[in-house]
UniProtKB/Swiss-Prot annotation:
Paramyosin is a major structural component of many thick filaments isolated from invertebrate muscles. It is a prominent antigen in human cysticercosis, may have a role as a modulator of the host immune response. It is able to bind collagen and has complement inhibitor activity. The gene is PMY. This is Paramyosin. Residues 1-18, 837-863 are annotated as: Nonhelical region. Belongs to the paramyosin family. Keywords: Coiled coil, Cytoplasm, Motor protein, Muscle protein, Myosin, Secreted, Thick filament.
Length: 863
């Protein structure tokens, strides 16, 4: 259910399919039946010709018998004239005749009782045979129905086997695809593991960079606070200069206040520097040294203020103009500081987004690792399932080879059984013909027995008439005694002549009777030999049939075991196919999920690229603004150096801010390098994914093309199979029509044969009537002791022959009943085994056909 690879291929059955093979085998069987019917018709025509020849011979014999009957009538007329002369002989023969008559009556009565009992037994056996025949016909109908069911089951099993072969090829293709997918998945797994390791390292670097960003952010915020305080100090310095223009004392007081404010600012700076992390320790120490230098400079300024008061008075007017300029620059710087604060807030928001994205990337990496582990487990399970499927595939290939060998052996055995069936059918036909001959002979013997009985009855009536005539004649003799005594002397010579003539006629009759006895004995011996030969042949045929029945039972058992093994193999294959389909569905779902995940990762990478580009643009803008600020700060520091030493302190602060900015720029450069490296890696990953997508699409296109080709091939195979099936069905119909015609002609031949048989029986009855008339005449003539002894001897011989034939008949009937009993037992065991083991094979149908044919023939022979 049947012939059936790491290449996506599929075997297509071309030529004759199993259904066409079955139809061709059916056609061959019908042709064999047609040949058998033709042979039977030829034999029937031959039998009809033989019967016509026998009819002609019987007609000739009837003509001869009619001629002999006319001669016997003439002889009877002569004998009637001589009866009166034989009365004295009759008186002497009466005593012996009466004793023989009594013995014959007793024997006749016993024979009639035995024959009647045998007839009743035969009628009972006939009734039983008819019942058995009806039961056998019902059983044959049931067996034929079961045979049709078995053939349908066999056809369905073969179609299932073909479907399983196609599924096996599909599973092989799927296993090849799964192996390739497993190799791709293994390579993707290794690549993803390396990429995961790289992403983990990059994530760690991102986290370190985030920490450094947070630290630089805190440093920048502290620097911005310092700048704010420096601007406030500049404003206070300007106010102090204005007050110094009014009064040196006020300037001194202001300078003292500035000193105190600078001391407070230095304390605040120390507190802020103390908040820096371990990475900014050098910066803290440098700031502390600079603050100490500032304090020393402020002390030197305090000492030099008295010296420079005069110079400041000269420069006051000039400084007013400079103050106005500084006011303008202050406004600009405040605006720029506000912009920087807004940019700082935007950078902080972007930093938060980057940290959130880093966390998402970390979660995604964990999820990918988990999915990679799941895929490794699934790949291992698929590998084990693939190995199991390959083992099942090899096992199924071996089973398919064994099945092909077994099918070839079964075909050979079916051919042998078909030949044996033909031989047994021909032997059964010969046996039926011989049985019909035996039945005809039996009917002939029964007719002869009836003739003898009627002749005996006629003889008894003739004896009674003769007794009456004897009494009358005795009275007449007493009356005519005197006259006869006178005439006796005259008639002595005539009596002697008559005695001589009667002796001659009696001798002729005895010779004819002896010839008839010899002919009868030869016929009986010939029939006896013929019956013995037929019985021996029937015994040999029964032995052959029993041996064939035993062999067929053995083959039935082996076939039932084979069918069970095939069913188990089909069930295992079905379970393996379902498991492979479920695994394929699971792998398909996982592939779809991985594709969706890759799409999500791609979208996230695109978002991260856009965010990186935005951050780079914003960083460039910030760098430009910082460069502008450095220029403005440099100008301010130059002005401050020319103004006062405290402006130099502010310039030092600005230098520190510039150094921090440079460090931030270095960090930004490193981040840009990391971002570029990540972009390259993402680009490579995208290229790998694109290559995988193109490969997958190519494989899908190839699979679609292969499926289209397979569908076209299947459609072509189905069209060709349907065409062949229709052709074979038409051929089967033609053969069935020819078979019906042959059957009809055979029926006509059988009808003609029956008609000839009826005509032959009518002629036989006529000849028997003639024989009976002849026997009556002979019985009337043959009144002597010699004739009675001849009858007695014939009756005894016929009794012996009938007893022998009846004993042989009973023995043959007993053997037939035993054979039928054995056949019934074998059929019951076969039906039991068939109900236990499922649908049988063709050998079982052959055995049942043999049994049904043999039983039908036996039933017809018994009838």
């Amino acid at each position: 259910m049947s012939e059936s690879h790491v290449k996506i291929s599929r075997t297509i059955i071309r030529g004759t399919s199993p259904s066409t093979v079955r139809l061709e085998s059916r056609v061959r069987e019908l042709e064999d039946l047609l040949d058998l019917e033709r042979d039977a018709r030829v034999r029937a025509e031959r039998n009809a010709n033989e019967m016509s020849i026998q009819l002609d011979t019987m007609a000739e014999r009837l003509d001869e018998l009619s001629g002999t009957s006319s001669q016997t009538h003439d002889a009877i007329r002569r004998k009637d004239m001589e009866i009166s002369k034989l009365r004295k002989d009759l008186e002497n023969a009466n005593a012996a005749f009466e004793t023989a008559e009594a013995t014959l009556r007793r024997k006749h009565n016993t024979m009639i009782s035995e024959i009647s009992s045998e007839v009743e037994n035969l009628q009972k056996q006939k009734g039983r045979a008819e019942k058995d025949k009806s039961q056998l016909m019902l059983e044959i109908d049931n067996v034929l129905g079961q045979l049709d069911g078995a053939l349908k089951a066999k056809a369905s099993a073969e179609s299932k086997l073909e479907g399983l072969d196609s599924q096996l090829t599909r599973l092989k293709a799927l296993t090849d695809d799964l192996q390739r997918q497993m190799a791709d998945a293994n390579s993707a797994k290794s690549r993803l593991a390396a990429e995961n390791f790289e992403l983990v390292r990059v994530n760690q670097e991102y986290e370190a960079q985030v920490v450094t960003f947070s630290k630089t952010k805190a440093a920048l915020e502290s620097q911005l606070d310092d700048l704010k305080r420096a601007m406030d100090e500049d404003a206070r310095n300007r106010l102090s200069l204005q007050t110094q223009l009014s009064s040196l004392q006020m300037d001194y007081d202001n300078l003292q206040a500035r000193y105190e404010e600078e001391a407070e600012a230095a304390g605040n700076l120390r507190n802020q520097v103390a908040k820096f992390n371990a990475d900014m320790a050098a910066l803290k120490t440098r700031l502390e040294r600079e603050l100490m230098a500032k304090t020393e400079e402020f002390e030197e300024l305090k000492r030099k203020l008295t010296v420079r008061i005069t110079e400041l008075e000269d420069m006051a007017e000039h400084e007013r103009t400079r103050a106005n300029n500084l006011e303008k620059t202050k406004v600009k710087l405040t605006l720029e500081i506000k912009d920087l604060q807004a940019e700082n807030e935007a950078l902080a928001a972007e930093n938060g987004e980057l940290t959130h994205r880093a966390k998402q990337a970390e979660n995604l990496a964990n999820e990918l690792q988990r999915r990679i582990d799941e895929m490794t487990v699934e790949i291992n399970t698929l590998n084990s399932a693939n190995s199991a499927l390959e083992a099942d595939n090899m096992r199924l290939k071996g089973q398919v080879g064994d099945l092909t060998d077994r099918i070839a052996n079964l075909d050979r055995e079916n051919r042998q059984l078909g030949d044996q069936l033909k031989e047994t059918k021909s032997a059964l036909r010969d046996a039926n013909r011989r049985l019909t001959d035996l039945e005809a002979l039996r009917s002939q013997l029964e007719a002869e027995r009836d003739n003898l009985a009627s002749a005996l009855h006629d003889a008894e009536e003739a004896l009674k008439e003769m007794e009456a005539k004897y009494v009358a004649s005795q009275n007449a003799l007493n009356h005519l005694k005197s006259e006869m005594e006178q005439r006796l002397r005259e008639k002595d010579e005539e009596l002697e002549n008559l005695r001589k003539s009667t002796t001659r006629t009696i001798e002729e009759l005895t010779t004819t009777i002896s010839e008839m006895e010899v002919r009868f004995k030869s016929d009986m011996s010939r029939l006896k030999k013929k019956y013995e030969a037929t019985i021996s042949e029937l015994e040999v045929q029964l032995d052959v049939a029993n041996k064939a029945n035993v062999n067929l039972n053995r083959e039935n058992k082996t076939l039932a075991q084979r069918v069970q093994e095939l069913q188990a193999a089909l069930e295992d294959e079905r379970r393996a196919r379902e498991a492979a389909e479920s695994n394929l569905q699971v792998s398909e779902r996982k592939r779809i999920a991985l594709a969706s995940e890759v799409e999500e990762i791609r979208s996230q990478l695109e978002l991260s690229d856009r965010a990186r580009k935005n951050a780079e643009s914003e960083l460039n803008d910030a760098n430009g603004r910082i460069s502008e600020l450095t220029l403005s700060v440099n100008t301010l520091t130059n002005d401050k150096r020319r103004l006062e030493g405290d402006i130099g302190v502010m310039q030092g602060d600005l230098d520190e801010a510039v150094n921090a900015r440079k460090a931030a720029e270095d960090r930004a450069d490193r981040l840009n390098a990391e971002v570029l490296r990540l972009a390259d890696e993402l680009r490579q990953e995208q290229e790998n994914y694109k290559r995988a997508e193109t490969l997958r699409k190519q494989l899908e296109i190839e699979i679609r093309e292969i499926t289209v080709k397979l569908e076209e091939a299947e459609a072509f195979a189905t069209r060709e199979g349907r065409r062949m099936v229709q052709k074979l069905q038409n051929r089967v119909r033609e053969l069935e029509a020819e078979l019906d015609g042959e059957i009809r002609r055979a029926k006509e031949a059988f009808a003609n044969a029956r008609k000839y048989e009826r005509q032959f029986k009518e002629l036989q009855t006529q000849s028997e009537d003639d024989k009976r008339m002849i026997l009556e005449l002979q019985d009337l003539l043959d009144k002597t002791q010699i004739k009675m002894k001849a009858y007695k001897r014939q009756l005894e011989e016929q009794e012996e022959v009938s007893q022998l034939t009846m004993s042989k008949y009973r023995k043959a009937q007993q053997q037939i009943e035993e054979a039928e009993h054995r056949a019934d037992m074998a059929e019951r065991t076969i039906t039991i085994k068939r109900t236990i083991g499922g649908p049988g094979s063709r050998a079982v149908s052959v055995v049942r056909e043999i049994n049904s044919v043999s039983r039908g023939n036996r039933a017809t022979s018994i009838m």
